[in-house]
Amino acid sequence: MKPKTRGEAEAEITQAVIKFEKEYLGRGPLDARTFFVHDMVLIRLRGLLTAGDRKLAETREGQSLLKETRRQLFESSITVFEEMIAQTTGCKLISLHTDISSKTGERIIVLTTNTNLEELYR
């Protein structure tokens, strides 16, 4: 079997994250991009807020509630990301960080691995 190119691996992670968002969180992004930066996988998702989320985000308390709820849901599913990274890259996931903008509906996900992915996919 031919090894994956960097673009193929990034695209595979993008598709897996879109599937995760739809299955676990109920809605997929309008746009998704994945980038390898040293030992990190940077994922940018746009258009994640529902009409209800946008209404909730009109107050500061609602914004905090939205961010915290989404963060907890996301971080409770870390095993999904461990498997995704292992299957796609053969690397081990070290940590997961995420935040969502309650104004734009953009989520940034940073996955740190045990391998320099830029060197792995030269």
Residue ranges: model-predicted function:
Residues 1-122:
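Interaction-mediating elements
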